[in-house]
């Protein structure tokens, strides 16, 4: 009897260890860098990090930021998803290494907003704030993936509301209300949530930053890009195809990259009223 009892105890112990090991394997692991960020962030900011995604479109080789709402949908800019359909878009949450895929997408280029429905329900999500504009001088922040930074956790950018503007994304389109922020918004931050620094309720969507170049300089760069004369060089386009470019086009590429990456501490965010109106008009299309 004693021997049988000992064997039974050993079997139960082994089964318990195996069950614990299996549970540990099934639990998603948080990347070390993300855990450092979570540990260092305050409780308000920490709650937002897990709902901010790195948005990537392999087909168009574009990237930006997106965020999960409480209703289960993901918001980003229309220009972040340009050239891709829902099935081609991939989102990487900071809370795990598991990619998020999408089944449906709607967008409005005039407002520069897009809504995507994940194929699998996602935990968490951010709330939209009150539709009252923040006062000039109010501290705001955003989490995102600027420039060539690809994570695993988003980076924090902070600033202050400096004013408001009406922006037309396309000729003849309606004017869209933007918040002007004196914050470091860079390519890659596009589509990220704009928060009041005191809480994690969404007050807008990061969309652009101001640049140094006046229109005449941009026109000169465009002319260089269209030049077909001069020395020819072998290069690779954004899709990996071999191409030939002229000397003038190489100069234009360098100037364009400088234009994109030059740090200017003024950015823009689509207002909350525009975001709410967009969601209300498009949400039913994702059901």
Task: Please describe what each predicted stretch is.
Residues 5-13:
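Sec-dependent N-terminal signal peptides
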Residues 14-20:
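C-terminal segment of classical bacterial N-terminal signal peptides
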Residues 21-68, 74, 111-113, 259, ...:
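N-terminal activation segment of mature serine protease catalytic domains
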Residues 52, 59-63, 72-151, 184, ...:
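Conserved active-site neighborhood of the chymotrypsin/trypsin-like protease fold
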Residues 68, 102-104, 161:
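Conserved hydrophobic positions within beta-strands
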Residues 69-70, 198:
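A cytosolic small-molecule/anion-sensing beta-strand core signal
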Residues 124-180, 185-193, 206-220:
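Flexible, gly/ser-rich surface segments that form the specificity/activation loops bordering the active-site cleft
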Residues 196-287:
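C-terminal subregion of chymotrypsin/trypsin-like serine protease catalytic domains
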């Amino acid at each position: 009897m004693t021997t049988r009892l000992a064997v039974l105890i050993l079997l139960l112990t082994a089964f318990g260890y195996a069950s614990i090991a299996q549970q540990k394997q099934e639990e998603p692991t948080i990347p070390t860098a993300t855990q450092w960020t979570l540990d260092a962030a305050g409780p308000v900011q920490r709650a937002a990090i897990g709902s901010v995604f790195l948005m990537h479109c392999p087909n168009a080789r574009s990237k930006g930021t997106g965020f999960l709402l409480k209703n289960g949908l993901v918001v980003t800019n229309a220009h972040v998803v340009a050239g891709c359909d829902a099935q081609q878009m991939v989102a990487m949450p900071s809370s795990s290494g598991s990619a998020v895929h999408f089944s449906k997408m709607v967008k409005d280029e005039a407002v520069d907003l897009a809504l995507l429905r994940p194929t699998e329900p996602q935990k968490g999500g951010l709330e939209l704030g009150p539709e009252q504009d923040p006062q000039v001088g109010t501290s705001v922040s955003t989490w995102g993936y600027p420039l060539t930074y690809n994570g695993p956790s988003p980076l924090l950018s902070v600033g202050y509301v400096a004013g408001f503007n009406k922006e037309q994304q396309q000729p003849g389109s309606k004017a869209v209300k933007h918040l002007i922020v004196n914050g470091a918004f860079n390519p890659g931050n596009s589509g990220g949530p704009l928060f009041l620094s005191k809480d994690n309720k969404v007050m807008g969507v990061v969309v652009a930053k101001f640049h140094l170049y006046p229109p005449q300089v941009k026109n000169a760069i465009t002319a260089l890009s269209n030049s077909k004369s001069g020395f020819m060089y072998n290069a690779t386009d954004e899709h990996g195809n071999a191409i030939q470019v002229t000397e003038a086009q190489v100069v234009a590429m360098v100037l364009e990259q400088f234009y994109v990456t030059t740090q200017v501490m003024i950015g823009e965010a689509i207002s909350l009223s525009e975001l709410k109106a967009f969601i209300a008009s498009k949400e039913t299309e994702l059901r």
